[in-house]
Amino acid sequence: MPAPLSRPRLAVAIVALAAILLALVQLERARAGIERIPLAVGDTPATLYRLEGDAEAPLAVVAHGFGGSRQMMEAISLTLARAGLAVVSFDFRGQGRSAIPMSPDAFPNEAGSSGTTVQLVRQTLEVVEAARALPGIAGPPALIGHSMATDILVRAADRLPEVGPVALISAYSRQVTPETPARLLILSGQREGGLREVALEMARQVAPDAAEGQTVRAGAVERRASVAPYVGHAGVLWSPTTLRELRDWLAPGRDTPVAATGPWILLLLGGIVALVWPAAVLLPARGRPGPAVGWRFFAVLLLAPALPAALLALNFGASVLGLAGIGRIALFFGVWGGVQLALLAHYRGLDRRIDAAALALLLGASLLFALAMDRYAAAFLPTGPRVPLMALMACGTLPFMLAHAHLAREAGIARRILLALAPLLALGGAIAVEPERLGLSFTVLPVFLLFLLVFGSMGRWIGRFTGPMTIGLGLGLVLAWSFAASTPLFGAASRLVF
């Protein structure tokens, strides 16, 4: 029989539910009065944000960074739309909802360009052209981009007949000159030391003594390098300072509220995760011990998969489903988990029972988290080519997480850290040795860490009331989902000439 909720668990449940409700109200309030109209620019998914009832508005085109999506830029889009701009935000090839992979020619040639850069610049120009043709658009387009998009937008601006103010966030582009872009805001997070220097270099092309937070001018050229306090490369997108700077640069004189949704997103996602802890106690108590593994055997299980997993990933799986690198990642995790499962099954035995209620709670909570993430923070639903990609990834992540769940069962913090670090170090080492084979998929490393932090916590709480087979199965599916939904897609072959 399920145990009754203790007072601490009941208190957590009440607080978590209140946090979720409050966050949802605030996040939807940030959208109130803003039209969000889906657009399709050829094969590019995009969204138009504008004030309800606005007849005419200046255009702003918003572009995300590598591995990002329109959702990651929505605080910016909502802020600018509320300030009176018509904002078009879009997903680059291979990212977000885009069904078209990027060119695999990501490494620069002798001229300093790459096939991927050429492809994304062309896509950006197509989006700008289509956005300018929308009814009610006035004036030249403003351009706003983050990280990777900063280089793409500067190159695109040089090819446009006219361009309005440009804002680059976490910029690294070396295409900025003392003359172009003419009106340029460069924003960085306080923790982005190197990129803050790049921002100052851009400002000092106009005034050698330019400082952060200072607007400098030379004729028609205007520059400003500004810093958002406390935040880094991702947090800068939700910083109120970033949002105010963008509003004031692109819509001067408009003292409209900014869409400071970052804390509410964290509260919503944190509330969903926290709710699993009290919910888990409602499960029937069917906990089963994991295999008895001493430190010596544990070390063998950590070291044995490293070399075969890395070598096989480097030499096989180059092109699967027409995508580059994806097969290698699935192979790495599958071999790693397969070796560990084989050793565990032979020497210790495996749990073989699946508890439907525990599995349903784990998958249901994970789905709820994914839906909230996808609506408010970042693209996190597998669509289009990412659906078969999830099935492929599951061939690797299921054995990996089944082995992981058996080894993590009743393990102390030291073993849990080692279980996370060993595959990360092996895969990271393989990427460093052969970046042209595995480097395009480096984003799986931070995704895996976030997966363990979020979904691993859910699995640990639910795992106290079930066995490792149930948790391994559930987390294996969720890890496949996470990789498939978030990994940038590169084609296995390119026909681009650049």
State what each model feature region is:
Residues 9-10, 261-263, 295-299, 351-358:
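Alpha-helical transmembrane segments and their helix-start/interface "positive-inside/aromatic belt" motifs
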Residues 268-277, 335-336, 395-397:
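Hydrophobic alpha-helical transmembrane segments
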Residues 255-268:
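Juxtamembrane/start-of-transmembrane alpha-helix segments at the extracytoplasmic/lumenal side
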Residues 300-498:
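Alpha-helical transmembrane segments of integral membrane proteins
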Residues 27-30, 283-286, 462-469:
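Membrane-interface capping segments at transmembrane-helix boundaries
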Residues 2-40, 45-48:
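An N-terminal hydrophobic leader/cap segment in hydrolases
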Residues 270-307:
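Juxtamembrane interface at the cytosolic side of transmembrane helices
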